[in-house]
Amino acid sequence: MEFLSIGVKIMPRKCSFCNEVENPQRRILANENDDAFICEYCVEGAYSIIYGEEKEFKEPKQSHNTEFKDITPKELKAYLDRYVIGQDRAKKVFSVGVYNHYKRLFKAELQDDDTELFKSNILLVGPTGSGKTLLAQTLAKFLDVPIAICDATSLTEAGYVGEDVENILTRLLQAADGDVQRAQKGIVFIDEIDKIARMSENRSITRDVSGEGVQQALLKIIEGSLVNIPPRGGRKHPNQEFIQIDTSNILFVCGGAFDGLETILKRKLGDKVVGFFDDAKEENKALLEKIEPDDLVHFGLIPELIGRLHVIASLNELNEEDMVRILTEPKNAIIKQYQKLFAIDGVNLKFEEDALRAIAQLALERKTGARGLRSIIEEMMVDLMFELPEYKDYDIVITKEVVKDNAKALLIKRKIS
């Protein structure tokens, strides 16, 4: 907050119209002499009066009293089980990590001793489409905390073309509807963190726009600091006003596929794991369960960043059975969503078991993981949905041939009694 000096008194800037004092949620504009002020909300009101638009006068968002629910890690995992198929170990590790983080925020002050609890950020290691983002999104929804999701590959150091690391916090503030206090207890998910690894373990002697330099920039906000961010994102400039965010209590979750990490682990472990499995996927699963911080340093993440990601959980590559379950079992399963869409038009949509397996096999062939399932079904359903209103009172059955050979779906007219 800026202050105006008058003699020996220091007074906060106050809107000359509504008499409200400047704060992080109410920005103040001043005239050239710095003796008349107007807040952004009065500017909106004036615009509405002058131009005759019925523009809603918005007061700043009031802070939510975010309280830690009386939940346990088991309850967190049980909620994840409703939306995330498989990945049992990862869900358990993630639930404990999230539980400890929010317990530290809301219950640590109840203890009488002076022991300070440091936050433990989380690293999720697993192939594309294995559920890394979904884990974070699901628990953020359950805990009713804002979440910002970004791709590490779009980030650059300050001063370079691209997205500033600090813009992540702008997204979080937007997800919190401008409530700074709520944003400061939110979750930031940074995907593809492995894509900004150094190409070698030796520190670069040249400027590194999207590798080590971005890791260093991330380190500053992940470890906990006061960061000034532009309220509407974009680049900073000297005359701009900022909102200050304290990142000390924000939970940072980083995710990445880390392709090639298995090679590093095989080299380290030798015959301790390698050769005991007939299936390559099972071998990789066993290897990833033995990840240690040093392995990630060898991969190309800087030691300082790894030192801030205390909880490491590995996710397995999904198999055909997992894919079929993802299609049908979660509370918001893709098949259930399409069945609801069809039911609105009076149509019953059914999938044969072989059709579900064919969809799962196609997603595995494309190597897109679970996130590729929706696009496969969408491609398959376009023609049907185009004519859907004409099929009222029909059952539509999707067979294996529809998926594999682009055959027509079975149309069965229901008997209306």
Swiss-Prot record:
Molecular function in Gene Ontology: ATP binding; ATP hydrolysis activity; ATP-dependent protein folding chaperone; protein dimerization activity; unfolded protein binding; zinc ion binding
InterPro entries: AAA+_ATPase (IPR003593), ATP-dep_Clp_protease_ClpX (IPR050052), ATPase_AAA_core (IPR003959), Clp_ATPase_C (IPR019489), Clp_protease_ATP-bd_su_ClpX (IPR004487), ClpX_bact (IPR046425), P-loop_NTPase (IPR027417), Sigma_54_int_dom_ATP-bd_2 (IPR025943)
Keywords: ATP-binding, Chaperone, Metal-binding, Nucleotide-binding, Zinc
Keyword Ligase belongs to the record: no
Pfam families per UniProt: AAA_2 (PF07724), ClpB_D2-small (PF10431), zf-C4_ClpX (PF06689)
GO cellular component, one term: HslUV protease complex
Residues where Zn(2+) binds: C15, C18, C39, C42
Family in the record: Belongs to the ClpX chaperone family.
Name of the featured protein: ATP-dependent Clp protease ATP-binding subunit ClpX
Lineage: Bacteria, Pseudomonadati, Campylobacterota, Epsilonproteobacteria, Campylobacterales
